[in-house]
């Protein structure tokens, strides 16, 4: 059986191909919501199309959140459903299964990790409703232990301030992180921290940005960025502490868009015995996670279990 894990319609698209429980192909295309040529390359990797398409999120559940947020154009848009993707890529003969967004993240990390047991932490802007989750990976299973839901989101908090500072949200958060290195966090720390009522819970939704802050001048930008990075770190610290208390396992798998914050990640080795993440912990590699959830197996290459994912052997 050939299973495709797929992510799409998030400005990028990716496909992972599993045949007979072996990972045969993975490729990520930037800047395209859909790419039929990528599908053709995936077909060539196994000389056949998919029997099953494993979608990285549950789009109908996502639409309930979009309705809650008043995003009615998104709710009515049927062109972003997996069936529409399959038709455009000429693989609409395949069965389609869907998996929760955060569970796809968690599976991409845990099922390619060197650990038989791990604490799995997923933090991003938003999935269907989940924005941060803690999982216990053990005996080939993932059990959700805790979650934070929209509109509370550390990822959206960081993206909102990315926009305030003149960068592109969900794309240029790394520029805020770099700018923070040149700032004084104490100047604006209290004001930035006040957006949280208590750990992981925002006072107001920041999905559409920070609207109660004047446009910062050049002198203030670095100090605001430094404060945002400091508050972000404090919030992730709380999640990491909660994660260990839930699982009592000192092996960490950390994935999701927020796991790309390299400045924070330096702290992880002080908090955990062993730490693992995938080369791209954001949405694209959730294609691998969705495929592995469908096969209910750890990743294998050439019949051997993957103990540390190396993308160069997949594409």
Regions found by a protein language model. Give the residues of each.
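Short acidic/glycine-rich loops and adjacent helix/strand connectors
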Residues: 1-315
